[in-house]
């Protein structure tokens, strides 16, 4: 799907869910800054992260492509496991489900896993 225009809202809509983040997209995002928007009462609260690792994973099913992205973010605010609006300044917005996977001195790592028919 084409570029999804950034919104000032953290709201997730059908257009955002329909946009597939592909392996090619993930490779372009490697080591790039991305922002997750946390829904708030009045406005979205941005959490700036860095794409720390992009890795393709083997699939037992034919024609299925699998990969993961690890995002490195600040200690606070901590994002819980859920789907967020993720924004890249040049590539636009996606709906991405992330899970916190590790906490170290000064940062928290989050992972998103993807799988789609290639």
Question: What feature does the model see in each segment?
Answer:
Residues 2-37:
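C-terminal segment of N-terminal export signals and the immediately downstream linker at the start
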Residues 27-29, 77-80:
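Short solvent-exposed loop/turn micro-motifs enriched in small/polar/acidic residues
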Residues 51-53, 98:
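Conserved hydrophobic positions within beta-strands
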Residues 57-69, 105-115:
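Short, solvent-exposed secondary-structure boundary/capping segments
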Residues 83-118:
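Short, compact, well-ordered microdomains
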